Amino acid sequence: VVKQEVMNEKVKEEITGQLEITKVDANNTNKILAGAVFEIWKDGTKIDTLTTNKSGKATSKKLEPGDYTLKEIQAPEGYTLSDKEMKFTISNEKIEVVKLQITNEKD
């Protein structure tokens, strides 16, 4: 007779988040803007670089919980580069999508 004891341990689900950017004209938020380039930073390290597509959207997936800074490094053609840094947090409580709508002024 062979006895074997098996123990199963529930693996904790990895919690990650996403950042979804929508880039629009400052004076007409219905006008979407493609070609804006952003960098995501965490603790002084660049995590990702995103470029908005023809729908004015860019998404970064699998962001670990923590505090991040989003910096625009290239404005869409004909628009002024924003010098604002946007802070956002990915929660360690649940999987989430952080959505930011960001505007640019025309040149």
Regions found by a protein language model. Name each.
Residues V1-D107:
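Solvent-exposed loop/turn and edge beta-strand elements of beta-rich ligand-binding domains
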